Amino acid sequence: MRIFLVSVILINACWAGPIVETNYGKVEGIEYEGAEVFLAIPFAKPPVDDLRFEKPVAPDPWEDVYPATQYRNDCTPHYRLVAQFSSYSGEDCLTLNIIKPKKAEKLPVLFWIHGGGYEIGSASQHGYEFFAKRYASQGVIVATVQYRLGFMGFFSEGTSDVQGNWGLFDQAAALEFVKSNIENFGGDPNQITIWGYSAGAASVSQLTMSPYTRDSYSKAIIMSASSFVGWATGPNVVETSKQLAEILGCPWPGAKECMKKKSLHEIFDAIEVQGWTTGTIDILRWSPVIDGDFMTKNPEELIKESPVKPTLIGMSNKEGSYFAALNMGRVIADFGLSPEDMPKVDEEFISEIIGRKLLYNNRYGENREKVWNDILDFYVKQGKPAEVKDLNGFYVDRYSELLSDITFNVPILREITSRVERKTPVWTYRMDHYDKNIWKKHIPEQARGSPHANEYHYLFDMPVMAKIDMKKEPDSWIQNDLIDMVISFAKTGVPQIEDVEWRPVSDPDDVNFLNIRSDGVSIEHGLFQEPLAFWNELRQREGFDLIDPTNSAMHSSNKDEL
């Protein structure tokens, strides 16, 4: 009997996964492809019941070894249909995942924040397998985090008691957990690179500025988004919160206690009544706000107080085509073109969109018609060729570019120039390459390019738009270059691409950038300078900023002083 028990103990010991001590207790992970993986480690108490719509609270210590061997809940999205696609969706979701090499000591850390418009997405959708094979194998540790989304993450009354930004506070708590515990996993707490894409990138931008987090990282990677945009500063979030509370029969102000008692089913029913998108250029119903706490000022002002640290900023050459021509992201943005709508896009179509979705609520007041004509002239009339074989393709492309500039290109360029003016070392790239399989046959050739989310195929092996064969060229070397770029930056603070002398941006008025094309890479200049100049001049002239309405007051006062 004694021999049998000893045998059982020895067998169990042989099958036990890697165990690491944290500040709250031990966690047991799994091994995969030469890496050690720890899944769904809690970094905060479940934000349920009395903790709903509150800042995250540190978890209670645990005595037994915590089984960090499988994913648990994704955070509740903003819309019931999205939640139904996830087998594991719920409020108890504040966990993070760590993927590390087996042998690790003082390794750099990539702290990944997923995108999804602050309303959908999860850490689990990225998996751990590719991170283990392509990142941990090259001597970096990856931490992927979850944060509250949609109404659970960003409900706000615009008061100190119900300020919103719960999702950003979750990210801050996760970052603090990693910084305090990563040394036990073989990581260097002084070499944490915060990294995100889309809303995850806007989050990274916000973390670099917030007094809660700006001293907790060493480098930042911001891909295809910026906090310098209205959809990341929530001009309508308080009004959206008020509408939701009223539909649910909760008092306003003072809705928090009533809202805490509402079930997810009741809230989803109310969202169905309210609608899950704004239908305007502000795009998101739920997003961060300028709360005077996490975000004490508008990002364009707050960045002046942020520390100077190496920053890598990237984008695609046709960001808006993801939402327009490809008709994707419909659960968060309402700008898509169906195959039936595509042939109808012309100057009149674009003009109607400008009036209804950009200049709604009489934006620009008595100058609204002039601004309307200025935008139409810049995006359609000035560039319209005298003779063109595919006029519809021209209009579809211009429609996509209008969305690209307002929601991505111009705010990203503004952030780049603001950081460079502060002497921050900023490396910039633009992704022009795309695999032809991501584009459907009905989409005009002129409107095609590298859309938003294109890098997901290469950085994470995630087939967002189509399955791409990464064994063929040029996709194989582009994938290698992008991953090497991220890893070298995390290790040294300088992104490195073989055979390319890539320097930080030196002139904010003529941004130099790495262009990643199908036929190679090269250093070029003048990144989206014309639309940047157009929107900056319009803001200065009118005292209102369509790119980020929360930033208008500052420029209105500047206008008055001139």
Curated annotation (Swiss-Prot):
Where are the glycosylation sites?
73
TM ranges are none
Q: Which GO terms describe its cellular component?
A: endoplasmic reticulum lumen; peroxisome
- Quickly give the catalysed reaction: a carboxylic ester + H2O = an alcohol + a carboxylate + H(+)
**Entry keyword set:** Disulfide bond, Endoplasmic reticulum, Glycoprotein, Hydrolase, Serine esterase, Signal
Tell me which positions the record assigns to the signal sequence: 1-16
Cysteine pairings via disulfide bonds: 75-93, 250-258
User: So where's the catalytic machinery, residue-wise?
Assistant: 198, 319, 452
Query: Where does the protein principally reside?
Result: endoplasmic reticulum
What InterPro entries does the entry give?
A: AB_hydrolase_fold (IPR029058), CarbesteraseB (IPR002018), Carboxylesterase_B_AS (IPR019826), Carboxylesterase_B_CS (IPR019819), Type-B_Carboxylest/Lipase (IPR050309)
Which molecular function terms from Gene Ontology are attached? Answer: carboxylesterase activity
Return one Gene Ontology term, BP aspect. Answer: cellular catabolic process
In chain numbering, where does the motif Prevents secretion from ER fall? 559-562
Q: In which tissues is it expressed?
A: Expressed only in the intestine.
Listed EC numbers: 3.1.1.1
Which Pfam families does the record associate with it?
Answer: COesterase
Q: What PANTHER family has UniProt attached to this entry?
A: CARBOXYLESTERASE (PTHR11559)
Q: What is this protein's record name?
A: Gut esterase 1
- Originating organism: Caenorhabditis elegans
Instruction: Name the gene that codes for it.
Output: ges-1
